[in-house]
């Protein structure tokens, strides 16, 4: 995994943290022939990591800043098997052929999951922070007939203080994996 500090960053554009990227990549169960759609690509951390392990990545974000940040990171890490599109996922999904999906953030998630179901996508991994969104997504996957697995990952970083060491927690992330039955 590439360390977070190595990525180009822009204020207001999120990045999936290194440890969360590692678990999410594992949940995608990537194969060198996979073509992956990255919805809500943010800073492009997942797009860069996925591109190293798959045939091609289509990245989507509805933020111009996110698109530009992702493009900067693709260039920085010499990624040539990824394109970045600006727009809403529900409008762009039909333009691409892919077999796996990573969703790091998006609006209209239920509509997007319905569109992905119509395309018979074999594996979808969704990262969420808000508990209500996690429940909504799990319920939608079950309604659509997917096998669903979910794990909540908490990461704490060590910090030295005068009297010893402490662990500083980051927000826990729920990683939801859906596979076709």
From Swiss-Prot:
Organism: Methanococcus maripaludis (strain DSM 14266 / JCM 13030 / NBRC 101832 / S2 / LL)
Family to which the UniProt record says this protein belongs: Belongs to the methyltransferase superfamily. Archaeal-type CbiT family.
Pathway annotation: Cofactor biosynthesis; adenosylcobalamin biosynthesis; cob(II)yrinate a,c-diamide from sirohydrochlorin (anaerobic route): step 8/10
Residues involved in S-adenosyl-L-methionine binding: 16, 40-44, 61, 89
Gene3D superfamilies from the UniProt entry: Vaccinia Virus protein VP39
Coiled coil: none
Biological-process GO terms, alphabetical: anaerobic cobalamin biosynthetic process; methylation
Swiss-Prot/TrEMBL catalytic activity: Co-precorrin-6B + S-adenosyl-L-methionine = Co-precorrin-7 + S-adenosyl-L-homocysteine + CO2
EC number(s) from the headed UniProt entry: 2.1.1.196
Alphabetized UniProt keyword annotations: Cobalamin biosynthesis, Methyltransferase, S-adenosyl-L-methionine, Transferase
Protein name: Probable cobalt-precorrin-6B C(15)-methyltransferase (decarboxylating)
Enzyme class label: transferase
Pfam families from the UniProt entry: Methyltransf_31
Gene Ontology terms for molecular function: cobalt-precorrin-6B C5-methyltransferase activity; protein methyltransferase activity
């Amino acid at each position: 995994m590439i360390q977070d500090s190595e990525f180009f960053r822009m204020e207001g554009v999120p990045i999936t943290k290194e440890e969360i990227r590692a678990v999410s990549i594992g949940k995608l169960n990537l194969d060198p022939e996979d073509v992956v759609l990255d919805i809500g690509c943010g800073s492009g951390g997942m797009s860069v990591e996925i591109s190293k392990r798959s045939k091609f990545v289509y990245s989507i974000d509805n933020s111009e800043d996110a698109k530009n940040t992702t493009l900067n990171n693709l260039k920085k890490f010499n990624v040539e098997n990824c394109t970045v599109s600006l727009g809403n996922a529900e409008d762009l999904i039909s333009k691409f052929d892919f077999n796996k999906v990573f969703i790091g953030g998006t609006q209209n998630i239920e509509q997007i999951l319905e569109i992905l179901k119509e395309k018979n996508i074999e594996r979808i991994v969704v990262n969420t922070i808000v508990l209500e969104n996690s429940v909504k997504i799990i319920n939608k996957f079950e309604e659509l007939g997917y096998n669903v697995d979910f794990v909540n990952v908490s990461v704490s970083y060590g910090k030295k203080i005068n009297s010893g060491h402490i662990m500083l927690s980051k927000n826990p992330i729920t990683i939801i994996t859906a596979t076709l039955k």
